Amino acid sequence: MPPYRSRTTTHGRNMAGARSLWRATGVKNEDFGKPIIAVANSFTQFVPGHVHLKDMGQLVAEEIEKAGGIAKEFNTIAIDDGIAMGHGGMLYSLPSRELIADSVEYMVNAHCADALVCISNCDKITPGMLMASMRLNIPTVFVSGGPMEAGKAEVKGVKRALDLIDAMVIAADDHYSDGEVEVIEQTACATCGSCSGMFTANSMNCLTEALGLSFPGNGSMLATHSDREQLFRKAGHTIVDMARSYYEQDDAAVLPRSIATLEAFENAMSLDIAMGGSTNTVLHLLAVAQEGNVPFTMADIDRLSRHVPCLCKVAPAKNDVHMEDVHRAGGVMAILGQLDRAGLINTSLRTIHSPTLGAALDAWDISRDSCSEEAQLFYRAAPGGVPTQKAFSQSSRYEALDTDREKGVIRSKNHAFSTDGGLAVLFGNLAPEGSIVKTAGVDESILKFTGKAKVYESQEAAVAGILGNDVEAGEVVIVRYEGPKGGPGMQEMLYPTSYLKSKGLGKLCALITDGRFSGGSSGLSIGHVSPEAAEGGLIALVETGDTIVIDIPERIIHLDVDDAVIADRHARMEAKGAAAWKPQNRNRPISSALKAYAALTTNAARGAVRDVNQLERR
């Protein structure tokens, strides 16, 4: 059996100094020998998705200690992508994922912790912690802060649900008065929690359920609802049981790499496709898989996207549906249940809470006769409708569940929104290593699109062009040098896509970038173009007026320019020497921290992870 890692610091005469320090943190004589559980919290007052997490670490710690473990809490950083959006702050968002992964690894390994509870929520925090858990491969449980309630307001005489994207789009729409914009601003983000649509944060928290690393409801139970408290309490006692299983019974099946196998990643990606999750999930799943040496690639995503249907559309794809509605329809377990009925997932895999995913679905899929009364009550949890920054502050219930699988929020395969899924991988000369589009957010009329390129060397230039009416219907906006290396940091293009909507061009234009998109983006928005411009990708050679062909059903993205012309452009680019493959006339200060990130990062097709082997090749 593997020895408890913590005994490196708690046992033996030579560790008297370390034990003395442990005692100074509150460890008692009788505690030595118990498993030490690291509680990685991500509380910050900067982020609504994390503002309510301050006491969550101690809530988990309380349960750990009741179960016979020693709990030690620490914090990671957390960046709010919405606040960092549209200015230089967004350059730091994706690189923060690596910092979060490193910080968890550093704390856990430096102090020889035996197991880990990850309290995450927003965009880069869950992926960063997932990367760390696969790296460390010690017993781990994930529990997130939960989604915020959708805002509710009267807009142009119509009562409707609102979210962050509504505030952004409407603010740039001249048809709305300053007073109307202010009302929307004050109501769009009503409570603590991750933004209320199927954006990156909620997508990733849903995927932890499919990976088997969190409890049912982790991705959909509202942050404000009292039922969410049980997820934190379950995490505390479950992690102690898992630690004992591994260290005392030699049960390696409880380790992250044993749970999050290739088949589990395929389940997670199938869920993502079925629910039209954020395109960022592709980037993050690839990165997490690499940390665990799981051979999950863009080719797997392409394969799955061709036969997994779109069973659920949530904001921004469907403006009147938010995470609270997904929860009422049975949450992730209900979507997985429909995928299981269609024979599209593997339910023999273990989870942290059940011997198999199939057993979990029997208990938690509200469409099954075997679904427990506990689960049915759990999924009736409703929004409270009161602005708050306090977790567990209300206990409202819907009178009934949404079990309509024909026209409801979650559909069966026979009544799917589309026969292929909500995400697609496009290949072609413009993206030989792949690119990603959220098809759930694309209007059917533009699934095939041919247009002239309008090229911008940065997000800022694209925003100025769109707002300055430089972009016309039928054009393909190209935003380049915004990839992991070229940005650096791979900014989200939420403002360009939002402003295209504001200008009435959301269904009339396409946008292609080597950057990425917010989970709130929709429209014909194609990102993650690989290779990126800064590494010699063809996107760097596109010129304004070139014809671009996009065919989502055939998974094609093509620059329709003669090979001889492309070869000539390539030669002229190479002739620039040190200035080659760099943006022209872009004035952007780049800090040393970002330069270090750019020096080691890979492109989006590899998850934009660090490749330290680059140092050996220099």
Curated annotation (Swiss-Prot):
<feature type="active site" description="Proton acceptor">
    <location>
        <position position="518"/>
    </location>
</feature>
<feature type="binding site">
    <location>
        <position position="123"/>
    </location>
    <ligand>
        <name>Mg(2+)</name>
    </ligand>
</feature>
<feature type="binding site" description="via carbamate group">
    <location>
        <position position="124"/>
    </location>
    <ligand>
        <name>Mg(2+)</name>
    </ligand>
</feature>
<dbReference type="InterPro" id="IPR042096">
    <property type="entry name" value="Dihydro-acid_dehy_C"/>
</dbReference>
<dbReference type="GO" id="GO:0051537">
    <property type="term" value="F:2 iron, 2 sulfur cluster binding"/>
</dbReference>
<feature type="binding site">
    <location>
        <position position="195"/>
    </location>
    <ligand>
        <name>[2Fe-2S] cluster</name>
    </ligand>
</feature>
<dbReference type="GO" id="GO:0005829">
    <property type="term" value="C:cytosol"/>
</dbReference>
<feature type="modified residue" description="N6-carboxylysine">
    <location>
        <position position="124"/>
    </location>
</feature>
<dbReference type="InterPro" id="IPR037237">
    <property type="entry name" value="IlvD/EDD_N"/>
</dbReference>
<keyword id="KW-0460">Magnesium</keyword>
<comment type="subunit">
    <text>Homodimer.</text>
</comment>
<feature type="binding site">
    <location>
        <position position="81"/>
    </location>
    <ligand>
        <name>Mg(2+)</name>
    </ligand>
</feature>
<dbReference type="Pfam" id="PF00920">
    <property type="entry name" value="ILVD_EDD_N"/>
</dbReference>
<feature type="binding site">
    <location>
        <position position="492"/>
    </location>
    <ligand>
        <name>Mg(2+)</name>
    </ligand>
</feature>
<dbReference type="InterPro" id="IPR020558">
    <property type="entry name" value="DiOHA_6PGluconate_deHydtase_CS"/>
</dbReference>
<dbReference type="InterPro" id="IPR056740">
    <property type="entry name" value="ILV_EDD_C"/>
</dbReference>
<dbReference type="InterPro" id="IPR000581">
    <property type="entry name" value="ILV_EDD_N"/>
</dbReference>
<protein>
    <recommendedName>
        <fullName>Dihydroxy-acid dehydratase</fullName>
        <ecNumber>4.2.1.9</ecNumber>
    </recommendedName>
</protein>
<dbReference type="GO" id="GO:0009097">
    <property type="term" value="P:isoleucine biosynthetic process"/>
</dbReference>
<comment type="similarity">
    <text>Belongs to the IlvD/Edd family.</text>
</comment>
<comment type="pathway">
    <text>Amino-acid biosynthesis; L-valine biosynthesis; L-valine from pyruvate: step 3/4.</text>
</comment>
<keyword id="KW-0001">2Fe-2S</keyword>
<keyword id="KW-0411">Iron-sulfur</keyword>
<dbReference type="GO" id="GO:0000287">
    <property type="term" value="F:magnesium ion binding"/>
</dbReference>
<keyword id="KW-0408">Iron</keyword>
<comment type="pathway">
    <text>Amino-acid biosynthesis; L-isoleucine biosynthesis; L-isoleucine from 2-oxobutanoate: step 3/4.</text>
</comment>
<dbReference type="Pfam" id="PF24877">
    <property type="entry name" value="ILV_EDD_C"/>
</dbReference>
<keyword id="KW-0479">Metal-binding</keyword>
<keyword id="KW-0100">Branched-chain amino acid biosynthesis</keyword>
<feature type="binding site">
    <location>
        <position position="122"/>
    </location>
    <ligand>
        <name>[2Fe-2S] cluster</name>
    </ligand>
</feature>
<dbReference type="GO" id="GO:0009099">
    <property type="term" value="P:L-valine biosynthetic process"/>
</dbReference>
<keyword id="KW-0456">Lyase</keyword>
<keyword id="KW-0028">Amino-acid biosynthesis</keyword>
<comment type="function">
    <text>Functions in the biosynthesis of branched-chain amino acids. Catalyzes the dehydration of (2R,3R)-2,3-dihydroxy-3-methylpentanoate (2,3-dihydroxy-3-methylvalerate) into 2-oxo-3-methylpentanoate (2-oxo-3-methylvalerate) and of (2R)-2,3-dihydroxy-3-methylbutanoate (2,3-dihydroxyisovalerate) into 2-oxo-3-methylbutanoate (2-oxoisovalerate), the penultimate precursor to L-isoleucine and L-valine, respectively.</text>
</comment>
<dbReference type="GO" id="GO:0004160">
    <property type="term" value="F:dihydroxy-acid dehydratase activity"/>
</dbReference>
<dbReference type="InterPro" id="IPR004404">
    <property type="entry name" value="DihydroxyA_deHydtase"/>
</dbReference>
